[in-house]
Amino acid sequence: MLSLLPDLQGKKLLDLGCGTGGHLQLYLERNAERVVGTDLSVKMLEQAEQELQKCGQFSGRFSLYQLPMEKLSELPESDFDVITSSFAFHYIEDFPTLLAMIANKLKSNGTLVFSQEHPITTCHKEGERWEKNEKKQQVAYRLNHYRDEGLRERNWFQQPFKTYHRTTATIINDLIAAGFQIEQMAEPMLAEQPQWHDEFKDLRHRPPLLFIKARKVINLTK
C-alpha cells in the first residue's frame, strides 16, 4: 500500500483502523507533518502511543482516537491531505456512508488509499473454497455467490466474525458517487513475492487483497 501513497512531505494524514500505529510511524518517517489514527481497540491505541513516543522527534505530531469508522463524522479533526486504511473496509456494512464521511474529512484533491479483502474472497458463502487434485493439492479457487452482496458470517479458528461482500463494480461505483476519481488499482499476487511461496502457497491462484488509490475531485454537499 505504501507504494500508492503520494509525497507525504508536510502533509496531514489520517489512518482508519490504525492498530498499533505501524503505518503512522512510517508516515512520520516520510516527513508527514502530522498524523492521526483511529481504532476500536484501546489496547492497540495504547501500544501505538508507546511506540510513537519512543521516537522523540514525533512528539506533538500525532493524535490517537478510540473511534469506529462508522462514526468518523465525530472525529474532531478534518482537512486531511491523505486518508488511509489497511485491510478494514470489508468489515463495514454501509460503504457509501463511510465514503461520504471520508470525503468530508479530506481537503479538495485529497487522496484516499486503502486495501481490503479482494471481492473474489469476500464473496464466498458455503462449501469448499478450493478445487483439489487426487493428491489433495489446491489447483483452483472456486468463485461462487459473487453477485450476492451483503453479510457474510465467517469463522477464524472457531472465532465468529462478520464481513460484507461487495463486487468490484460496486466498490468503484460507490467511490465515484462519493466524488472520487480512481487513480490506481493493484491486485498483488504471490508470484510477485517468491519468499512467501511455501508459507502461502494457497494464494498462488488468486489475489488476496484489492488496493485502491482515489482522489477527491468533487465537493458534495456536507
What name fits each language-model region?
Residues 74-83:
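A short acidic, Gly/Pro-enriched loop at the edge of an enzyme's catalytic core
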Residues 96-111:
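A short glycine-rich, Lys/Arg-flanked "PGG" loop and its adjoining helix->strand segment in the class I
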Residues 87-90:
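Short catalytic micro-motifs in class I SAM-dependent methyltransferases
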Residues 113-149:
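Conserved class I S-adenosyl-L-methionine
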Residues 120-124, 155-169:
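Acceptor-substrate binding/catalytic loop of class I
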Residues 1-11, 26:
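Conserved alpha-helix/loop element of class I SAM-dependent methyltransferases that forms part
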Residues 14-16, 20-72:
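Class I SAM-dependent methyltransferase SAM/SAH-binding core
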Residues 162-185:
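Short alpha-helix
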